[in-house]
Amino acid sequence: MNLGIVLSEILAEAEYTPSEIKELLAQAGYDVSLEKLTDHLNLLVTMGSARKHPDGKFSTLPF
């Protein structure tokens, strides 16, 4: 499965911190740096595909 799909599935499950997401991606076989992951998550927020909560956790936007 591709990284983007796995990340989308993770974000759809619940709210996670970037560190928690990195760990879940590692369990799925993906090695991503925390810095690049955080940058990508912030890009998803900017594009309107994800939400960043006040506590620093990320999730997908509800449809």
Report residues per predicted region.
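A short, structure-level motif marking secondary-structure boundaries and short turns
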Residues: 6-7, 24-27
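Short beta-strand "wing" residues that participate in macromolecule-binding interfaces
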Residues: 52
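Positively charged, polyanion-binding regions of nucleic-acid-associated proteins
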Residues: 1-15, 36, 41-49
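Short, positively charged loop/turn segments that connect secondary-structure elements
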Residues: 26-40
